[in-house]
Amino acid sequence: MKSRKKVVVGVSGDRISGLPDALICHILSFLPTKEAASTTVLAKRWKPLLAFVPNLNFDDSIYFHPRARRNKYSKSYESFMSFVDSVLALQAKTKTPLKRFHVKCEDVVDQSWVLEWIPKVLKRGVLDIDLHITSSRNYCENSSFYSLPSKIFVSKTLVRLKIQFQDGVHIDVEGGVSLPKLKTLHLDYFKIETSMLNKLLSGCHALEELVLANLMWADSSEDEACHVSVSIPTLKRLNFCRSEDFYEGEFHFYEDYDEENINEGVSLSFDNPNLVYLEYSDVIVDKYKQVSFDSLVEANLRLRKTPDQDETDKVNVTKLLMGIHNVKILYLSDDTLEVLSCCRERIPVFDNLLELTIKTTPYVGWKSLPPLLKSCPSLETLVFEGLHHKYTKRCGDKDGCLCKYENHWGTKKKKNVRTCLSSSLVKVLKILKFGETFEDENEDGLDVDHDDYDDEDAVSCDEVGGVVEEQIEHVKHFLETMPVLKQVILYYNTPKDEDVMKVFKKLEKLPRVASANCNVQISSKNLSLSSTSTKRGTLL
């Protein structure tokens, strides 16, 4: 019988060094570049391998020691920028193709320095660029936006491009635009002329995901009215957001920016037959020339009036709403509710809408909800994000609101008014952030400041307890009115279990509910309670 030799591998055995260089480079490509560079001390053979790593991922949070962050302009701070330079210079000598170039910085000494890296990686045929720069330089009135290098708009290899400079960048497409392979484009905090945006999008024939966030229109030398067209047949996801933080925050120091002319003379067109997701946040433009989303499944609308429009001004967003009428899932912000309450024309019918989420605040009434719900014949799930309500003169009118109160000389008064809820086919009702309070509803008993919104109509609680009691009354009204409810879920915004118990007991005492069989569930971070009520209010 032949003896078998037992092979013992020591704990210190090096199995990685025996791997081919290409495989080691592949392994290193999954590490942050700082850590990949640190591996060169393991063996002489490893030192040149960093030059061939196809994925570069620079993160200053990994590079810096926490104490070094206290001095933004220390040598260690600038050494991060120099480290990126040295790695790019090392790889440039090998002319190795580059797949991914990611940079994430919270502290950058010079953002123009970051932009100088873009042409260098473009020469290497990079597929994926992601620059996430959240630091801010010192603001001054003469500051200007940095410009993206024009070469970035004629890349034959780019598949994914994400640019976020919190200081903002200026996009000026001097020559042509040709991005034949680009599928994902994210631009965040940027300024561009409307004509330049049209030119940019016209060169992205394969685009599937487009994010235009924190967008500012640059001054245009053109005399004719500005028109923006987002028409990309391949597009599947679109995020078009002009955030108030950008044009009302620190960025207004860069130029004299007139908030009253945010969208003056601007018209929009959307023609995207394969789009399935839309997020649109903006003040109302002059005109929506065309809105066509044939395949839309989900939409998130955050419409706002312009600063020079008051509550009584009529607006026309009918064409925009018609363009999304086939959506199945819809989210509406509180500002959008206000816009809908001022529509010149009727809200179109949303035949396919199954789930509707509504954000509420104490500053916006529910005037637009009855006509909206009447326009959703297939609605099954209704979600309130917060259950805040502003009492107006319409409360108490037939289909003037969803509450059971009227505003009687500045006080709430119960009134039995038949609303559209009595014919609602909604089966699931969810209340997110139940018990949430705003600053003017907090425990200090601060009065609501009505100077900014129709103080003649407004009536509000001045205590947290009162706010919760008011929200309980709304839930009771829903239970007593909605005939086919199967489930009501309250996500209570409280750390106290006794708060959940109190609300649960109040809902238990309902003498009757409209639905034959409805499950009521209250959940907080620590506790979840549920019960089933019959039409007579009996708990099962």
Swiss-Prot record:
InterPro entries hit by this protein: F-box-like_dom_sf, F-box_AtFBL13-like, F-box_dom, FBD, FBL60-like, LRR_dom_sf, LRR_FXL15/At3g58940/PEG3-like
Keywords of the record: Leucine-rich repeat, Repeat
Transmembrane helix recorded as keyword: no
CDD domains for the chain: F-box_AtFBL13-like
Repeat keyword on record: yes
Signal peptide: none
Gene3D superfamilies linked: Ribonuclease Inhibitor
Domain annotation F-box: ranges: 13-61
Pfam family, one: LRR_At5g56370
PROSITE patterns to which the protein is assigned, alphabetical: EF_HAND_1 (PS00018), FBOX (PS50181)
Ranges occupied by LRR repeats: 80-105, 137-165, 189-214, 217-242, 254-282, 329-360, 361-386
Domain of life: Eukaryota
Protein's name in the database: Putative F-box/LRR-repeat protein At5g41840
Originating species: Arabidopsis thaliana
